[in-house]
């Protein structure tokens, strides 16, 4: 809906949002895994959270400037990168918290909870944009700001994560 309202063609959407994003997700999932191994789960989560918020600001820029395939390509690459990285970081974090004896059940519950917020927000985003009088730029800025409480909470539990992460 966003891409169409901004003025991108179906061909642009398919090329950049679908095809390019697929490759970016594969490549950066591997890179995200390497970064989490090298720097730890806490840093991986923190960097992913900040990067995801920043990627939403690129969507706000698209909403302000109008259709530009080069900006769309950059935005899709950055968004795919941050999405892949954050998924890897979240999977590592959830796996870290699971007890081996109950790992399947615990992982399923925590994974479901980790996407519940995103699903609820995504399903109501149209109503939010309508209440903002179609201001997609403001919507994406608000979604970037909404990350701040999660990052503050993550920062407050960093010592616990590092303690559990250390063998």
Which residues does each predicted region cover?
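A membrane-interface helix-boundary motif in multi-pass transporters
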Residues: 127-149
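Multi-pass alpha-helical transporter architecture, strongest
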Residues: 141-167
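C-terminal ends and interior cores of transmembrane alpha-helices
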Residues: 50-67
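Transmembrane alpha-helical cores of Major Facilitator Superfamily
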Residues: 15-23, 50, 77, 108-116
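Helix-to-loop junctions at the C-terminal end of transmembrane segments
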Residues: 27-44, 129-130
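Short amphipathic helix-loop junctions that connect adjacent transmembrane helices
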Residues: 1-15
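Loop-to-transmembrane helix entry/capping segments in MFS-fold secondary transporters
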Residues: 10-11, 100-110
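Intracellular juxtamembrane helix-capping segments at the cytosolic ends
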Residues: 84-99
